């Protein structure tokens, strides 16, 4: 192995990433995430822009659509990805944000739906909408702040126990039991009262709103890191 190869390998191994994700965000994400997010954006546009007098869902659809289409276009041109690595990582972060928006929109529809057709007017008028939106916004901001804390200089380089839980570990057993108890406490009353759809909508929103920001924050950190280490990664 040449000296340059050894040096590059050392640089690749040294990039820090926070908890919850096994490996740091890679440039290859730009080849997959925009397609998934674009599908959800299409659903957001179809389901949310009808009778959208306030224009909130139209604006969100345009933002998400622009980000995802730009990501798809760039993904077909590896030269641009490698030339604009910082921009690509930022684009990945925005793509993940559009994923969160799309998934939370689906969760919102599950919460407020009564089986009839739903448009923006029904969403705005539902008494459950503000509670769901405020909850998801709070969880999103909390998750972003929590994951960003792990990237502070004083915390970098640490190996977090959260990422080291293995099969048979007591901590894993505790987390599994907690997850089962939480799901049971949410779903069982919903089954008994007939509100299972609402429960799944809330669980979907909570689960992904708390986890996807880990990818988004790491993508932002990667965009900062790549400016100091331009040879860190290449898309082939």
Listing of model-derived features with the role each one plays in the protein:
Residues 2-3, 67-78, 139-159, 220:
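Membrane-water interface of transmembrane alpha-helices
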């Amino acid at each position: 192995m040449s000296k340059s190869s050894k040096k590059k390998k050392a640089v690749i191994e040294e990039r820090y990433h926070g908890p919850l994700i096994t490996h740091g965000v890679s440039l290859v994400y730009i080849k997959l995430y925009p397609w998934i997010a674009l599908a959800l954006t299409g659903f957001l546009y179809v389901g949310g822009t009808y009778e959208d007098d306030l224009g909130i869902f139209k604006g969100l659809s345009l933002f998400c659509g622009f980000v995802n289409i730009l990501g798809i276009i760039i993904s077909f041109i590896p030269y641009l990805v490698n030339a604009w690595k910082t921009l690509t990582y930022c684009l990945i972060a925005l793509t993940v944000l559009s994923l969160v928006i799309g998934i939370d929109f689906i969760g919102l529809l599950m919460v407020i739906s009564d089986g009839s057709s739903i448009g923006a007017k029904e969403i705005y008028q539902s008494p459950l909408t503000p509670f769901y939106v405020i909850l998801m916004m709070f969880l999103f901001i909390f998750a972003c702040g929590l994951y960003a804390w792990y990237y502070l200089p004083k915390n970098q380089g640490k190996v977090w126990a959260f990422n080291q839980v293995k099969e048979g570990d007591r901590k894993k057993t505790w987390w599994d039991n907690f997850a089962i108890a939480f799901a049971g406490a949410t779903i069982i009353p919903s089954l008994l009262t007939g509100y299972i759809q609402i429960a799944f909508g809330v669980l979907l929103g909570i689960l992904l709103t708390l986890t996807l920001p880990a990818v988004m924050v790491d993508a932002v950190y990667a965009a900062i890191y790549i400016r100091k280490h331009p040879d860190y990664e290449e898309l082939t």
